Amino acid sequence: MTDHALLLVNLGSPASTQVADVRSYLNQFLMDPYVIDLPWPVRRLLVSLILIKRPEQSAHAYASIWWDEGSPLVVLSKRLQQAMKKEWSHGPVELAMRYGEPSIETVLTRLAEQGFKKVTLAPLYPQFADSTVTTVIEEAKRVVRAKSLKMQFSVLQPFYDQPEYLSALVESVRPHLEQPYDHLLLSFHGLPERHLHKLDPTGKHCLKDDCCMTAPAEVLATCYRAQCIQSAAAFAKRMGIADGKWSVSFQSRLGRAKWIEPYTEAHLDELAAKGVKKLLVMCPAFVADCIETLEEIGDRGAEQFKEAGGEELILIPCLNDDPNWAKELNRLCERAPLML
């Protein structure tokens, strides 16, 4: 049967490195209530203040990592889409971005016009967060309601602990760990602490007594930090990396609110101060390289680490369009449960 479409969804990117395009993208991204979870008037005011200087700064950062083909995240996501076409046997494989183009609305509308009524929605985020997974699902729901689409959705669940994801990660990273190195840092995207607190159904566990490795299932299901910590620990165990030779941190903090710690920026200085000279960094919250990996870690992070006394920071590529990752991702998508 070829009547079941697969829709891969990643975060998105500005259309270009022009300041106007970056401003438009940031406005759409930051005005999402799942990203900045404040009342609309407060969110609008805050985003308006951010958009005074941030677009120009971000445009410069994007320009430093932009490829001839376009945004690295978009290009790599398209390559993964092509790789998935060799694996998914039930119908077309489409790609959408939560922010920017091609939008979820554009792609779902086209699939509906082509007669597809079964769609597996695959948010490409290993760990759960409202600002990634939930917003993708809610946007799909909004489109279905607004367009009166007759579709059934299976939804890929967070796969931070799934053997397929961990296997793909291990095989992708293994060659990079064959070189001598002092320390491996797993840098995950950060979140405001309040995003975690509000999702703790018990109100008792979040960020208390180092609960990330012992959180009960009901808490773990929606705790981003715990899922990151457990992803990292499972990866290190599979790789046989000794305790003390790897660590976890959280990057990309925005604003003055308290975010989950330790912060990558501070941790880089700490590692250099401890005598780490050759540092390997991987970013397991991202399945495709993007501005947060290439510019924030590969460029700025590497420069900061050297200034702090380190000698070399090597960024390990994300899974990107690795053929083995495509095979494992297909296995995950095959068993995505019917949800919508």
From Swiss-Prot:
Its EC number is 4.98.1.1. CDD domains: Ferrochelatase_C, Ferrochelatase_N. One of its GO terms (molecular function) is ferrochelatase activity. One of its GO terms (biological process) is heme biosynthetic process. Keywords: Cytoplasm, Heme biosynthesis, Iron, Lyase, Metal-binding, Porphyrin biosynthesis. It is found in: Cytoplasm. GO terms for cellular component: cytoplasm. Pathway: Porphyrin-containing compound metabolism; protoheme biosynthesis; protoheme from protoporphyrin-IX: step 1/1. It holds the Pfam family Ferrochelatase. Its main location: cytoplasm. It comes from the Bacteria. InterPro entries: Ferrochelatase (IPR001015), Ferrochelatase_C (IPR033644), Ferrochelatase_N (IPR033659). Catalyzes the ferrous insertion into protoporphyrin IX. Belongs to the ferrochelatase family. This is Ferrochelatase. It comes from Pseudomonas syringae pv. syringae (strain B728a). The gene is hemH.
